[in-house]
Amino acid sequence: ADLLDVYLSEREASPRYVESLKRTVKHARTCGLLDTSQLLPEKVNEFLTRLPLAAVTRSNIRRELLTLWRFAFEHSYTDVPPLRVCRIKAAPPPPRAWSLDTLRTLLAAAEKDERPVSRRIPGLLWRDVLPCWIVIGYDTGLRLSDLLHLHESNIVNGCVICTAQKTGKFTVRSISPAGQELAARLFKRSPDGTLFRWALPRRRALGKWKDFLREQQIVGSSRWLRRSGATYVEIKRKGEAQKFLGHSNAALATRHYLDQTLTMDIPESPPPLR
């Protein structure tokens, strides 16, 4: 953990990246990698092999651990270079997103959900919160952490203006008239000016989405709002999804966000046999 503190003291890092690095260090310490003297190829390979996590997650942990190890080597905290660490093949599954029909089904169901959000907020129902989340999430493509941190001051001239928690990038996204109306209603009830956070801690938000989608028998998660928004932006104007998502690498959108069954960016089919 001391190495991580030194590493972070010498560079700027987004809150999400800091959280991710801390999780990686916690995993390493739990598995016996307690200090820089134990950063050895055989120990790191054993650690990565034994992690009971998906290949994509283990690949991310490997990358972050090598980053810290390289920093330790360059600053003479260890004389062992970060070499001979086995690669982890982690091919992400093809990205999926919701169609407009599915999004409208979700929105209609959310508007009818009359269950209370929390005992501590009498009178606040899910139909007051969830439709706003769906529309704003789809309109803006903001990540969960950014949605939760939205404040009334972030809404200007029909747009969201904020700094992305994960990347630290300045972000401006337009909101549809329906989204503006839903947000205005919710802001009137907010005691602290936040749009969602006053009523929805992160854990409750994730739990509600999981339960809501299971009840509707619809596959996905709240992050599919970002994918769906990006997919339909790409359909509307090819190449625009990268800007919508705030990516500096154009390949990320295609690899992780755009549902090609919706964009129809697929090869021509051969002639039918019948």
Where are these regions (language model features)?
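N-terminal core-binding DNA-recognition domain of tyrosine site-specific recombinases/integrases
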Residues: 5-70, 77, 92-96, 115-126, ...
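DNA/chromatin major-groove-contacting recognition/catalytic segments
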Residues: 171-177, 181-186, 243, 254-274
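C-terminal catalytic core of tyrosine-transesterase DNA break-rejoin enzymes
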Residues: 132-135, 139, 145-146, 224-248, ...
